[in-house]
Amino acid sequence: MVNDKARRSVIQFEDVSFEYSGAETDSIHHISLDVKEGEFLVLTGGSGCGKTTLTRLVNGLGEQFYEGTLKGRITLLGRNISEYPLYEIGKKVGSIFQDPKSQFFASITEDEISFGCENYGVPYEELDRRVSSAIKRINGDMLRGKEIYPISSGEKQKIAVASVNAVDPEIYVFDEPSANLDMYSVEALKNLMGGLKAEGHTIIVAEHRLYYLTDLADRFLYMENGSIKEEWTAGELRSIPEEKRRAIGIRAADLHHIEVDISPVKEKDMTMEVKDLAFSYRKHPVFHDVSFQAYAGDLIAIVGHNGIGKTTLSNILCGMQKEKEGQIIYNGTKVSKCKRKNFAYFVMQNTDCQLFGDSVEEELLLNGKGSTQEQRDDLLKLYGLFEWKERHPATLSGGQKQRLTLAVSDWIDTPVLILDEPTSGLDFKNMMRISEHLKALAQKGKTILIITHDYEFAAMTCNRVLHFVDEGHVETFPLQENLSRLYSCLMCQ
């Protein structure tokens, strides 16, 4: 590796603080940072610690798009970043956001990938080459020519990465890039990042999941309350004692040291039975002959590759979509689509679709009429949201929004609770908080189904696995003594 002193600085923060309009305190404060050309930097820390704000300042959005006050100086490639027009920063700094839909402009995958190049006037022949190369990098041949809306969240994330890759900026900024990806796709993302690093690109990643970055990152910066508190190499990160890692709330650096943290549930009353379920989208089969049973107290991890139909199955179970064939039986009775909402509640992956209040507390009031102030406060404290009770949900971080939707689900007393990627955007502390709460609900007899790609979370939370092997075939197995099988299921998707 070239000595840092011999490499030019591409990004410099000099005593930088930033406060969003309406906020009582700075989101980040007194940050001083020097990022060298070709460096791979990872920002980690608890939800709301300032990681996303720091990335917004690197790509120019913090000062030029979001309302707020910036103090200090940010230098990008030798110039004060405030001197650049935003479109010029976009050529130099490519951004992949936590919610990929927020950066889409086209309805077809290849149109989206080419959109940035077209805006910068890239000649057609070169544009076609870049688009093909970007699709190859994300292993996305199956996504060519597809409409963006119906593809899965993980596939949307891939398209976002490809669209930035086609522009070929010098600096890449990723905000929680693995949040919606299965483990196989995370490996593909890792390889993509490794290729970018080998080409000399500077890469900044804000991330909770760290295991896939330890072979790539030059530095890990741990943030807390808007400040950089610690800095580690990959070796130092792996050497952090388990007690300290849990205390500061960071994810595992090595998945092979994770153990099952839940006992098998003794078979109780059957809550739900699915028989020969089939579904098609625009005459294209999504799955068929899906059958399984779920019991009171079950915590079932639903796994399978992106786009195989896990979310569609959940939509059908709670009455938001109708199956083509098959039966869904709750408590021994076949239930029609319109009545399923009384039996199953679905916490969606896209939390914005379920948040309607003008404040965090009002969100609870909309769903918990008749609740007392003490009950609402206790629930917000349980999910670590009490100090944000007056904040508008739109101003929360991704992890905070996720916890709010879970808090709302507590008011809805259905025998079955279904969650779609509940740990997306969560740090270790909040992942543990969610895990312990779901286990407490299961102990009370609730049946819980969790769509997840998160091996660490599934190992500490679930007792059974429902694996979509391929379209039309599922298998179930107990997680106890089958942890390696779960790992294989997630890695071979």
Tell where the protein language model's regions lie, with residue ranges:
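The feature captures the beta-strand-to-loop junction immediately N-terminal to the Walker
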Residues: 44-46, 303-305
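Helix-to-loop junction immediately C-terminal to a conserved catalytic motif
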Residues: 59, 318
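Conserved ABC transporter NBD signature motif
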Residues: 67-79, 326-340
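Conserved ABC ATPase "signature" region
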Residues: 125-143, 373-388
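Conserved ABC ATPase signature
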Residues: 147-151, 155, 392-396
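Catalytic Walker B motif of ABC-type/P-loop ATPase nucleotide-binding domains
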Residues: 172-175, 417-420
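H-loop/switch region of ABC-family ATPase nucleotide-binding domains
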Residues: 207-208, 452-453
